[in-house]
UniProtKB/Swiss-Prot annotation:
Acts specifically as a negative regulator of skeletal muscle growth. Belongs to the TGF-beta family. CDD domains: TGF_beta_GDF8 (cd19388). This is Growth/differentiation factor 8. The gene is MSTN. It comes from Canis lupus familiaris.
Length: 375
């Protein structure tokens, strides 16, 4: 009996010394720890997102081989942007990005952008010859994107002013050459006859692929072209030097070059949203807004979904390189842990002005994070 009393006294003494146990306080502490962990995760993701946006700006300039962003204002874009069918079609039916989960990442050219279409505007140059005392339109400069790729199509687009009565228009495209002994200064490229009805003006395209290929082989022969579009009364309807109200009606070249993307294998990863509590490596949504940067030189897309990777990479979750796990087990202090990085990326299509005020349409590789993993 005495032994039982002694045990009871000891138990009461322990309760008095330890004090009352507040279960609600422990619960609050646990909740605070969890909230603090979530806040830290949110801050980490926000920092990762900001770093990703800055990296994207640097990558775009680098992949387009631009030292700085072209200094083109919105007003200049409106003036320079042709109001022509091929360009309107690109903008209206613009495919911002391809996100086909059944395909692997595109790895064409590994780094630099691959051009599909180039819109070349007339350039100002001293090389343009004077014919009959007047400068003749037009002279075109060609970037390396055209020079070092196979040209599959080249169309010269010209705008014909509207007519008041039905008429037949005779269109002539002449290539300027060095003066011959007989005084000849040009040679014919293409001629055609059009019937025009009263109303609005029209855009007309002319195949100049052969001429362009010759210019690329012999750049010194590129002295420019002359455009004529005479109606039955001898009036020239071709817009070569746009006047008031004719912004965007300049002649231009639409050049298409080859593009042969390669395919690679696919892998898998986690997808999360900004409210996710997932701690593991995961892909999060991120929209890049070019207008917010003041990058008016990018015609389309004005924004795109880039996404980013964030999260922990414990060795038990290692997805891509199992040998790293073995290295860590053999030397846990001497091996760096895996990082949450993109394991699959895809390109975006972009329509933009380069530094020479040429409009270029092409792919920029590895700009969209499709999947994330630990490596």
């Amino acid at each position: 009996m005495q032994r039982l009393q002694i045990c009871v006294y000891i138990y009461l003494f322990v309760l008095i010394v330890a004090g009352p146990v507040d279960l609600s306080e422990n619960s609050e502490q646990k909740e605070n720890v969890e909230k603090e962990g979530l806040c830290n995760a949110c801050m980490w993701r926000q920092n990762t997102k900001s770093s990703r946006i800055e990296a994207i700006k640097i990558q775009i300039l680098s992949k387009l081989r631009l030292e700085t962003a072209p200094n083109i204002s919105r007003d200049a874009v409106r003036q320079l942007l042709p109001r022509a069918p091929p360009l309107r079609e690109l903008i209206d039916q613009y495919d911002v990005q391809r996100d086909d989960s059944s395909d692997g990442s595109l790895e064409d050219d590994d780094y630099h952008a691959t051009t599909e279409t180039v819109i070349a505007m007339p350039a100002e140059t001293d090389l343009l010859m004077q014919v009959e005392g007047k400068p003749k339109c037009c002279f075109f400069k060609f970037s390396s994107k055209i020079q070092y790729n196979k040209v599959v199509k080249a169309q010269l687009w010209i705008y014909l002013r509207p007519v008041k009565t039905p008429t037949t228009v005779f269109v002539q495209i002449l290539r300027l050459i060095k003066p011959m002994k007989d005084g000849t200064r040009y040679t014919g490229i293409r001629s055609l006859k059009l019937d025009m009805n009263p109303g609005t003006g029209i855009w007309q395209s002319i195949d100049v692929k052969t001429v362009l290929q010759n210019w690329l082989k012999q750049p010194e022969s590129n002295l420019g072209i002359e455009i004529k579009a005479l109606d039955e009364n001898g009036h020239d309807l071709a817009v070569t030097f746009p006047g008031p109200g004719e912004d965007g009606l300049n002649p231009f070249l639409e050049v298409k070059v080859t593009d042969t993307p390669k395919r690679s294998r696919r892998d898998f990863g986690l997808d999360c949203d900004e409210h996710s509590t997932e701690s593991r490596c995961c892909r999060y949504p991120l929209t890049v807004d070019f207008e917010a940067f003041g990058w008016d030189w990018i015609i389309a897309p004005k924004r795109y979904k880039a996404n980013y990777c964030s999260g922990e990479c414990e060795f038990v979750f290692l997805q891509k390189y199992p040998h790293t796990h073995l290295v860590h087990q053999a030397n846990p202090r001497g091996s760096a842990g895996p990082c949450c990085t993109p394991t699959k990326m895809s390109p975006i299509n972009m329509l933009y002005f380069n530094g020479k005020e040429q409009i270029i349409y092409g792919k920029i590789p590895a700009m969209v994070v499709d999947r994330c993993g630990c490596s």
